[in-house]
Amino acid sequence: MASALGIFIDRNIIKYAKLNGTKDKLKVESYGMKYGQNHKELLKQIIEETNSAKSNVVINASEIHYEETSIFSMLKKKDYDKAVEVAYEEITDRQKLRPELLEYGYILSKDPADPEKLHVLLGIQEKTAIETRANLIGQNANIYSQMPIGISIVNIYNGALPAIIVNIEEDTYITEVFNGEPVRVTRIGTGTKNIISTINSEENSISKSYEVLRNMVLPIDDMDQISFEGNEYAPVIVSEIMKIVSEIKNIIKKNTGIYRKIYITGTGATISNIETFIEKLIDDVECEILKPSGIEEQKRTPIKEYVDVNSAIALAGEALRI
């Protein structure tokens, strides 16, 4: 049976999930997290502990730059690559980038604003960043691909309606989904990074700081006068979430009437009441936790247990949902 290991590398944490099965019915074989900044050693441990030396490994790409463009929808499929290449070269020329130092990939989707066009979401990365990340794995396993998490996260979403997926890791990745495809990704330097740093200054342990964060409960009774009583870390958590909410509001404002659904995932999704908290701050939307679609629920592990490693599950899905 085919299997794949998804690995999401962040500054202070590495999340992993090994999946096996077929495209529409996947099983989580193992999952977990490692804490610290010695990424090379932690990755070696993960590959050994999950017996993944011969499995396909998908890791999140680093330092991705996103661009948007379009091509004519009347083109034949065999001409898509060339049309995107021309559009990409126009972007690199305009921005005075050096294409020989870069790699790019793209996602096509229907253009909501123009039926005669296909929307193109480009992910551009420096070749040196690709090599640096590949060297972390070395000869320990086979790297199937390096994928932007802002694009891969759609692997675990199967909704038919337009939606905004908010993946709150150390940074936050906001993915706009239209017709089942990612059309725009916004990365903001707000997420759990500052929260963990604040907690760690008291706890002096990254792993314990993450556990403290996961046990947080956001107050939702009175949104006009939020009470921080009995929760010393609540102010920094609320401050970070407010910044994320502000970005979501900007996206909704630019796309009036399109997005009515928001999904929260990542470490931030483990904070109790976060979906209700955000829903109360944004008019005319529903907000819920993103449960990974296509994953077989197991008796001893309910689906909600996987939410914290959704980023890794989504990456593993790249190798199994072709």
Language-model-detected regions and their locations in the chain:
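Gly/Thr-rich phosphate-binding beta-strand-loop-beta motif of the actin/hexokinase/Hsp70
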Residues: 1-34, 53-60, 157-202
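N-terminal phosphate-binding loop and adjacent alpha-helix
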Residues: 26-51, 77-80
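Short glycine-rich phosphate-binding loop at a beta-alpha junction
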Residues: 50-65, 142, 255-268
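Active-site neighborhood for divalent-cation/phosphate handling
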Residues: 63-159, 294
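Glycine-rich phosphate-binding loop plus the immediately following alpha-helix
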Residues: 131-150, 179-225
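Glycine-rich phosphate-binding/hydrolytic loop that grips phosphoryl groups
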Residues: 157, 288-322
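Adenine-nucleotide phosphate-binding core of ATP-dependent small-molecule kinases
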Residues: 201-202, 214-261
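Glycine-rich phosphate-binding loops at beta-strand->alpha-helix junctions
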Residues: 259-283
